[in-house]
Regions:
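Conserved Nudix-box catalytic region and its N-terminal flanking loop in Nudix hydrolases
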Residues: 1-34, 76, 82-88
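Short loop segments at secondary-structure junctions
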Residues: 5, 25, 70-74, 95-96, ...
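Active-site segment of metal-dependent pyrophosphate-handling enzymes
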Residues: 6-8, 15, 37, 41-76
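Nudix hydrolase/Nudix homology domain
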Residues: 12, 49, 53, 57-60, ...
């Protein structure tokens, strides 16, 4: 997981790597691989589609696709970090701890909460 400061809420939040489809022609899986590398320095051997949802369908068309990354290896070459990624903390978190952190509201990122719960319900942790 990553811990990142989010100015609108004035807090550091536990999150999963995430980003935008901001490379022309890029699909969700390619973006997930790129963001994982940019934010953590890890490469995924496999990415499994986990869940996809609209964040606020009453007011936005924003769509989130979450993948479960497996067979991670630390990359020898890490892309330069953007300013927003400079203070990110990357930490391995035991899945049971992550799940309990969602249930106790310590994880407040909706993407992280939905992804962790989906992995738990699918028995993929």
């Amino acid at each position: 997981m990553i811990r990142q400061y989010r100015h609108p809420v004035g807090q550091f939040l536990w999150e999963i790597p995430a980003g935008l489809l901001d490379v022309e022609g890029e699909n969700a899986e390619s973006a997930a691989r790129r963001e994982l590398l940019e934010e953590t320095g890890y490469l995924a051997g496999t990415l499994e589609p986990l869940i996809e949802f609209f964040t606020t369908p009453g007011g936005s068309s924003e769509n989130i696709a979450i993948f479960l990354a497996r067979d991670l290896t630390l990359s020898e070459v890490r892309p330069p970090t953007e300013a927003e990624e400079a203070d990110m903390l990357v930490e391995w978190v035991d899945f049971a701890v992550a799940l309990e952190s969602v249930l106790s509201s310590d994880v407040k990122s909706p993407s992280a909460a939905v992804g962790i719960m989906a992995a738990a319900l699918r028995g993929q942790a």
